[in-house]
């Protein structure tokens, strides 16, 4: 017969084996397969990347102690660099060393290069919108307009990849203007208040900037709601670019009644000095005020007001901070009414478009690298789209109105050559297929303020 001692040893062995199996199962459960959205590869990584060892603290009392990962640091970094921004941010709380690595500028720059390459295969759009003024309010009182929603949309699937709501310290009085994306960052400001921010929606980081002199002047001239209604068109949009450092550029027309002030003024924000400065040499042409400047290939571009019946394009070299006038623009653009034309960046190239008032056909031209000639790349014919495809839009905006002189704004080009379109008066965003001449609804948020081509990044604390 089995003695009591043998029975006790047998039970202890079984208990030990059971604990070992549980430990192995627990270790396997801690390892997860994280799918990188950027390149579609499956990366096996541990959320903690640490080995657990136990140090005995007396009989029957053990304390769990974490030891660093056995993987080399450079291997761990390469894994982290290919994870989505949200996953990387979560890893910061697991290790002081990882937090230091992830928050370093070198890591942010390396991650930026990877996501820039992946944007071709996985194009995305950022949608910025206000919250309804009474949503979540107390006592039916309007909530302050300090909340802005940011939603990232996948162009191919039209699905929402992420959404976040950021509350800013100072409100915008429902006059929100946003720049194009620069390395995943946006500049958001208002002319009715002195609010101006640089924000990274992916990391939720933002920085409030001192108001530009132009903002201060506008608030002095138009301090109330009544006076703002009578305001003449002004330049509402900044350009957010990166040379050696990040820059905000604000070009606007001077007071036409005072010729001693010059024709235009240009303010540039220096992030290191935390201050605005004037450029001494500015264009001798007044720029068309109601436009969004386009930035690509190291330059920022603006339309001018018509001179002798002809529109010109001025450009600022963001490295040398010098202005130039393009030698030639498309004749159809040059002789147009400024309200009928638009400028944008598509596939890293400067593009211009014009909408014909009688046919509503909109043609898009791209500037060649020599800057002396243009090529037609797309034609948008919304009137030829079937009425059934147009009837699905319920926001009250008619994309084929004959009296709508402003053209649609191309936001991005999908991999299947479909064109993503927005309009300053529309809340929704549509996708136009030039092959079969059809349109489909992509996204319709409430109180949308801006659509912009976008990719997530870790760049913060600039």
Swiss-Prot record:
Alphabetical list of Pfam families matching this protein: Beta-prop_KIB1-4 (PF03478), F-box (PF00646)
Residue intervals passing through the bilayer: none
Gene3D superfamilies per record: 1.20.1280.50, Kelch-type beta propeller
Segments of this protein annotated with the region Disordered: 1-59
InterPro entries: F-box-assoc_interact_dom, F-box-like_dom_sf, F-box_dom, Gal_Oxase/kelch_b-propeller, Kelch-typ_b-propeller, KIB1-4_b-propeller, SCF_F-box_component
Positions of the F-box domain: 65-110
Feature: compositional bias, Basic and acidic residues: 1-22
Skewed-composition ranges (Basic residues): 28-40
Protein known as: Putative F-box protein At1g12855
């Amino acid at each position: 017969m089995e003695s009591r001692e043998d029975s006790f040893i047998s039970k202890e062995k079984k208990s030990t084996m059971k604990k070992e199996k549980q430990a192995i199962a627990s270790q396997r459960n801690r390892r997860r397969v994280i799918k990188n959205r950027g390149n579609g590869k499956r990366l096996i990584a541990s959320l903690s990347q640490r080995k657990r060892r136990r140090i005995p603290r007396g009989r029957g009392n053990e304390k769990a102690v974490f030891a660093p990962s056995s993987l080399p640091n450079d291997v761990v970094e390469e894994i982290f660099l290919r994870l989505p921004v949200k996953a990387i941010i979560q890893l910061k709380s697991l290790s002081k060393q990882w937090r230091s690595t992830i928050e370093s500028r070198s890591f942010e720059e390396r991650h930026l290069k990877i996501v820039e390459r992946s944007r071709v295969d996985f194009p995305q759009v950022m949608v910025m919108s206000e919250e309804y003024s009474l949503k979540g309010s107390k006592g039916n009182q309007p909530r302050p307009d300090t909340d802005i929603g940011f939603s990232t949309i996948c162009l191919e699937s039209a699905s929402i990849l992420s959404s976040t709501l950021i509350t800013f310290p100072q409100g915008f009085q429902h006059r929100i203007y946003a720049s194009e994306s620069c390395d995943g960052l946006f500049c958001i400001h208002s002319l009715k208040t002195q609010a101006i921010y640089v924000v990274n929606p992916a990391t939720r980081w933002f920085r409030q900037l001192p108001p530009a002199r132009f903002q201060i002047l506008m608030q002095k001239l138009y301090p109330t709601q009544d006076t703002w209604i009578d305001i003449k068109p002004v330049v509402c949009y900044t350009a957010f670019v990166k040379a050696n450092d990040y820059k905000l550029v604000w070009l606007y027309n001077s007071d036409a009644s005072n010729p001693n002030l010059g024709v235009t003024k240009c303010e540039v924000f220096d992030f290191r000095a935390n201050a605005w400065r004037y450029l001494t040499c500015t264009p001798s042409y007044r720029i068309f005020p109601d436009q969004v400047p386009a930035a690509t290939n190291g330059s920022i571009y603006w339309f001018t007001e018509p001179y002798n019946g002809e529109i010109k394009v001025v450009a600022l070299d963001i490295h040398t901070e010098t202005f130039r006038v393009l030698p030639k623009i498309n004749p159809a653009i040059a002789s147009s009414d400024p309200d009928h034309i638009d400028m944008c960046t598509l596939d890293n190239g400067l593009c211009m478009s014009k909408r014909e008032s009688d046919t509503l056909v909109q043609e898009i031209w791209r500037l060649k690298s020599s800057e002396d000639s243009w090529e037609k790349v797309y034609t948008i014919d919304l009137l030829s789209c079937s009425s059934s495809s147009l009837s699905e839009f319920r926001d009250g905006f008619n994309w084929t109105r004959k009296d709508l002189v402003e053209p649609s704004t191309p936001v991005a080009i999908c991999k299947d050559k479909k064109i993503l379109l927005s309009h300053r008066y529309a809340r929704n965003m549509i996708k136009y297929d030039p092959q079969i001449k059809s349109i489909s609804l992509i996204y319709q948020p409430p109180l949308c303020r801006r659509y912009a081509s976008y990719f997530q990044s870790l760049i913060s604390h600039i």
